[in-house]
UniProtKB/Swiss-Prot annotation:
Gene3D superfamilies: 1.10.150.530, Aldolase class I. Belongs to the radical SAM superfamily. RlmN family. CDD domains: Radical_SAM (cd01335). This is Probable dual-specificity RNA methyltransferase RlmN. It comes from Chlorobaculum tepidum (strain ATCC 49652 / DSM 12025 / NBRC 103806 / TLS) (Chlorobium tepidum). Its cofactor is [4Fe-4S] cluster. GO terms for cellular component: cytoplasm. Residues 125-360 form the Radical SAM core domain. The keyword Cell inner membrane does not apply. One of its GO terms (biological process) is tRNA methylation. InterPro entries: Aldolase_TIM, Elp3/MiaA/NifB-like_rSAM, Methyltransferase_A, RlmN_N, RNA_MTrfase_RlmN, rRNA_lsu_MTrfase_RlmN/Cfr, rSAM.
Length: 374
């Protein structure tokens, strides 16, 4: 979160307090919890205890927090409330394939404290159960093929609103599939790197080793259009998360038409940022490439992708376009897709093809939107 956003948030909090409103303590990050308890005359370790109650035990009342003194619990209850996000809607895939496997993708509508809505997706398979979570309400980048970009941008999610999505989907995974989440992907609504402070805070909570829910950093993937400064910050943070870059074209003009941000972050700048990330982390990135008929699926497009991919340490993940009724894009045809893949393989590149899941309930890549797409 930028400094001006933080100051605006604090001004809002002070204004609400002056009007006698109790604020949601889950708005506060770990650092802010420490500052709060210090102001209340408590030792710093109390913040860790409070954080554990909120995010490991997922307490809903301060009275439950037995490791805190009664006086502190009463003080907190007089000024704060505990208000996690809530599940308000579910849509489940009912295709023949999903019914046969018994692993239907499910999309969840989640209501936040201010009544804003966000979507998350549970993607089960035989090997894993993946939570696809959002980092923003809407998205300011306005990629032309993406439903989220067309719904506009409302605000960043707080760290707790991000973790709440995971907690809600973990409960649904246990209930529906009798096993918990194995992977988390930041591939829902929004650009995670535009909300990096809260994304990193949420990852810190979700990977806390002795919490009731804890997942390895290596099981988390952050997807981005490729913001160089923020990519460098992730690389130097020491995080072991995976990084996926939404490339979609290795032709500068085509990429600009698909993704307006590409006018500022050119392919040369992106390659430089990826090389820096590779150098710092010694890890490859995944280049995500969505095939669109007549736009980026020609043999020449494949040749350009080969040239770009050979400039960086990467693997390539090809995905089909998931149709959106109000947009005119079409997925690449099977014959052009086959030839495209073969060109990449012949060039010695590592290629995977992502099986689309959730398209029939608008839960697949690029389809999430809590407002109509115009």
């Amino acid at each position: 979160m930028e400094k001006n956003e933080i100051s605006e948030e604090r001004r809002t909090q002070e204004k609400e307090k002056q009007h006698g409103h109790r604020l949601n303590i889950r708005r506060l990050g770990r650092k802010e919890l420490t500052e709060l308890l210090t102001r209340l005359g408590e030792p710093a370790y109390r913040a860790n205890q409070l954080h554990r109650w909120l995010y490991s035990n997922q307490a809903l009342r301060f009275e439950e927090m037995s490791t805190l003194s009664k006086q502190l619990r009463q003080k907190l209850a007089s000024e704060w409330i505990i208000h996690p996000a809530s599940l308000v809607g579910t849509e489940r895939e009912t295709t023949d394939a999903s019914l046969v496997t018994g692993n239907p993708t499910a999309k969840f509508l989640i209501k936040l404290e201010d009544n804003e809505l966000v979507e998350s997706v549970l993607i089960p398979s035989e090997e894993r159960i993946t939570a696809c979570i959002s980092s923003q309400i809407g998205c300011p980048l306005r990629c032309t093929f993406c439903a989220t970009g067309h719904m506009g941008f409302r605000r960043n999610l707080t760290a707790s609103e991000i973790t709440d999505q995971v907690f809600l989907l973990e409960k649904e995974a246990q209930k529906r599939h009798w096993r918990g989440l194995t992977n988390i992907v930041f591939m829902g609504m929004g650009e995670p790197l535009l909300n990096l402070d809260n994304v990193l805070e949420s990852i810190g909570t979700l990977t806390e080793k002795d919490y009731q829910f804890s997942i390895s950093e290596r099981k988390i993937t952050i997807s981005t259009v490729g913001l160089p400064v923020e990519m460098d910050r992730i690389a130097r943070s020491g995080l072991k998360t995976k990084l996926a870059i939404s490339l979609h074209s290795a032709d500068q003009l085509i990429r600009e038409r698909m993704m307006p941000i590409a006018a500022d972050i050119t392919l040369d700048k992106l390659a430089k940022a990826i090389n820096s990330y590779n150098s710092v982390t010694s890890q490859p990135v995944t280049l995500v490439y969505m095939l669109l008929e007549g736009i980026n699926d020609s043999p020449e497009d494949a040749r350009k992708l080969v040239r770009f991919a050979k400039r960086v340490l990467c693997k390539i993940n090809l995905i089909d376009y998931n149709s959106i009724v109000t947009l005119k894009f079409k997925p690449g045809c099977s014959s052009s897709k086959t030839m495209f893949i073969q060109q990449l393989l012949d060039a010695g590149l590592l290629v995977t093809v992502r099986k689309s899941q959730g398209a029939t309930i608008n839960a697949a890549c690029g389809q999430l939107a809590t407002r109509p797409v115009r």
